[in-house]
Amino acid sequence: MVQINEIKSNSRDTRTAAHTHIRGLGLNEMGVAKPIDAGFVGQTEAREALGLVVDLIRASKMSGRGILLAGGPGTGKTALALAVSQELGPKVPFCPIVGSEIFSAEVKKTAALMENFRRAIGLRIKETKDIYEGEVTELTPEEAEDPLGGYGKTIRSVVVGLKSYRGTKQLRLDPKIYESIQKERVAVGDVIYIEANTGAVKRVGRSDAYATEFDLETEEYVPLPKGEVHKKKEIVQDVTLHDLDVANARPQGGQDVMSMMGSLMKPKKTEITDKLREEVNKKVQSYIDQGVAELVPGVLFIDEVNMLDVECFTYLNRALESTISPIVILASNRGMCRVRGVDDDVSPHGITTDLLDRLLIVRTLPYSLDEIKTIIQKRAVVEQQQISEDALDALAQHGARTSLRYGLQLLSPAGVLAKSEGRDVVEVKDVEECESLFLDATRSKGRFTDKFL
C-alpha cells in the first residue's frame, strides 16, 4: 500500500482584526444595498450614499469635498470608510488617521494635517524607457593601461552579449555600468535588463535553460525574454505627493560611513516647508501637462474628528478648497458638544458650523436585535467559532442591551471556556460565565460610582 502523508503548513495565521469581515459596500449593479452582503448587515441608506460617493471619486468629480459619517458608537462608521477604500481598490490612496494623531511637540498641527492630505493624493507616473533585455552570453571586460602609470590596469569598457527569442546583440558598455554588473553579481546565463538612459542594471534571474544545474543556492529561473533585445518598455509607478516631499526634503547622501552616521544622528522629525511643497507641485504640474503623469485624488479618513480644535477646522476649510485636495471623510459619534479651543461654542458633532456647511452628512443608525444577531453570527464564522443558537441569542441580547462591541468581545473568551471543558460549540453557560468575569461599561460605571465616589 502506498503511504500518503499530508503536509501541514507552518505559516502563521493572520490576525483577525475588528473589520476583517468587511469586503466592500455590498451594492448590486443598480447601486442598491443588499440587506446582508460583503460583511455588512443593515445600514442600507449609508451604504447607498457612499456608493454614490465612490462613483463620483472614480469619475474624478469628488475632489476637494467632504463627507461626515455621523452616528453613535458601534454603528459601523469606521467599517463604512474601510469599505469605501476596498471599493476603490489598491491603486487609489487611502489614508486613515484619528483626530488625536496630529498633535505633536515637534510638528505643527496644520503641518501634520497637510502631510496626511498629501499622503492621500496619488501620482501615477507613466514612463517609457529604452532597455536592453536578454540572457547574458558574453561578459568580457576590456582593459587599458593605467593613465597614472604603474603596473596596474583599468577597465576601459565591457562587452556584453545579450540573447532573446528574436535575436542577439553585442554591446560595449561604460566602465561605470561594469561596476553595477559586479554589484548585481551577473554571470553568463543570467537574464538582465539595462536601462539605456541611466545605465541601471537589474538582474531578473537565471535563464531556465540552466534549470537542470545543481547548485547549493536556490536560484529563480526565468524564461528567455520575448521580442528583440532592444525594446521600449512602459513602466507605471504609483507614488503619493508626500513621498515626493520626503524625497526632496531629505536628499540621500553618499553611501560612505560618514553619510550613514549623519543620517543616524538626526532622528528628529522635521517639518516640510510650504516652499518645498510649492516646488513639488510645480514639478508635478509640469509632468501632468506633458502627459507623463496623472493625478489620483485618494481618500483621507479622519476618525473622532471632534478631537480636532478650532485651528484645525479653520485649516480644513482652506485645504478642502485648494486645487490639489483629496476626498475627506470625517467620522464623529458626538451630538451637540463644545468645539475644542473655544469655551462657549457648542456645535453639532463638535465641528464648527462653517466646516459643517461644506460637508455632506451621512447618518448611521443603531442596529436592531436581529441585525446584531446576524453580525455576531458572521464574526463567529470569521473567528472559526462554533456557537449554539441559544448562546447566539444570549450574545445578541447583551449587544442590544449594552453595545455591539461588548457582545462581539464576549465571543472569543466564550470559545476559550468551551475548549477548556472539551467542547467545540459555545453554549449559554459559557456566555454567562464570561458576562460575570467581564463587566460592560454600564455595570462598571454603576458599581464603581457606588464604592469610590
From Swiss-Prot:
Residues noted as binding ATP in the record, renumbered to the chain: G71, G72, P73, G74, T75, G76, K77, T78
EC numbers for this chain: 3.6.4.12
Location relative to the cell: Nucleus
PANTHER family recorded: RUVB-RELATED REPTIN AND PONTIN
Stated role: DNA helicase which participates in several chromatin remodeling complexes, including the SWR1 and the INO80 complexes. The SWR1 complex mediates the ATP-dependent exchange of histone H2A for the H2A variant HZT1 leading to transcriptional regulation of selected genes by chromatin remodeling. The INO80 complex remodels chromatin by shifting nucleosomes and is involved in DNA repair. Also involved in pre-rRNA processing.
Entry's family note: Belongs to the RuvB family.
Complexes and interactors: May form heterododecamers with RVB2. Component of the SWR1 chromatin remodeling complex, the INO80 chromatin remodeling complex, and of the R2TP complex.
Identification of the protein by name: RuvB-like helicase 1
Origin species: Yarrowia lipolytica (strain CLIB 122 / E 150) (Yeast)
GN (gene name): RVB1
